Amino acid sequence: MNKLMLMLITFATSLLAQTNKASTGLKTDQSFNNSLSESVKLKEIADIYPTNTNFLTGIGIVAGLAGKGDSIKQKDLIIKILEENNIINEIGSNNIESKNIALVNVSLQVKGNTIKGSKHKACVASILDSKDLTNGILLKTNLKNKEGEIIAIASGITQPNNKLKGSGYTIDSVIINENQNINHSYNIILKKGNYTLINRIHKILTSKKINNKIKSDSTIEIEAKNISLLEEIENIKIETNPKILIDKKNGIILASENAKIGTFTFSIEKDNQNIFLSKNNKTTIQVNSMKLNEFILKNSNNLSNKELIQIIQAAQKINKLNGELILEEIDGNQN
């Protein structure tokens, strides 16, 4: 077949090199090999996140604003906050009346467990009428959980939060001073929801005696009490669905080992280059159930690359193709 550029790659983990003998030798970027692999590590198709998120908040004072702070309209409220935080003696009435301080809300979101001594970044927002908190000094502020327990202490220099495009400020020095109830639950979240795949992962975890529960087509909740177990889970090998990659432009077909084609009958008009014969010769092809790479090898001498691709696409449309069909152009000039 003159212009046929046919590549059959069967991926069965350790047999990759051997099965590549069925290829025409076209150089293809290794990333395509990886994309067709039927065995991947869990961390390649999913992320692991703690199930718990701790929200800590507190009301504090930013000082050193040099006339950019709150007006004296809320003087009584500011004094009350200073007294609650035991810093009333650090702030003189002159600072309140000269707009050098501002009443602020400090908030912190901690994903996972709050660990004593750990350092975090918090958001700071003006509560009253201060317009600019840049380079102010957040005085010691208690951050509490929803139960009212003091979990962290915040203080430091306020800086604009560029991620919020000019609105809001941050501080970098929030120290957790109390451990909360330690939670060992995590969610494995697939990058693309798939009930078959999520159930496959569930069975593997169960076989390894790892407590887990399917929550949706993309999420499994697990229990992991140490980092080493999380590392083991990240590196679990998962068998994914077979894949078939087709490059129509270059006439390339890549099929993973377990991709299969079912039984059906296909009618196609073959282009006949003999001028003495009919230019359009309709041919009926009986396709029997077999592995896709076997089907292509069996018919590569009788069918063109275009015809093979037509048959594969037709099989997909009538649910006779076991595998995910990917249409993509491959650069065969890569080394």
UniProtKB/Swiss-Prot annotation:
GO MF term set: structural molecule activity
Organism of this sequence: Borreliella burgdorferi (strain ATCC 35210 / DSM 4680 / CIP 102532 / B31) (Borrelia burgdorferi)
Signal peptide start-end: 1-17
Keywords: Bacterial flagellum, Periplasm, Signal
Main location: periplasm
Keyword presence, Signal: yes
Protein name: Flagellar P-ring protein
One CC-aspect GO term: bacterial-type flagellum basal body, distal rod, P ring
Keyword set includes Glycoprotein: no
NCBIfam families assigned to the protein according to its UniProt record, in alphabetical order: PRK12706.1
Role: Assembles around the rod to form the L-ring and probably protects the motor/basal body from shearing forces during rotation.
Lineage, broadest ranks: Bacteria, Pseudomonadati, Spirochaetota, Spirochaetia, Spirochaetales
Compartments it resides in: Periplasm; Bacterial flagellum basal body
Subunit and partners: The basal body constitutes a major portion of the flagellar organelle and consists of four rings (L,P,S, and M) mounted on a central rod.
Family: Belongs to the FlgI family.
Alphabetical GO biological process terms: bacterial-type flagellum-dependent cell motility
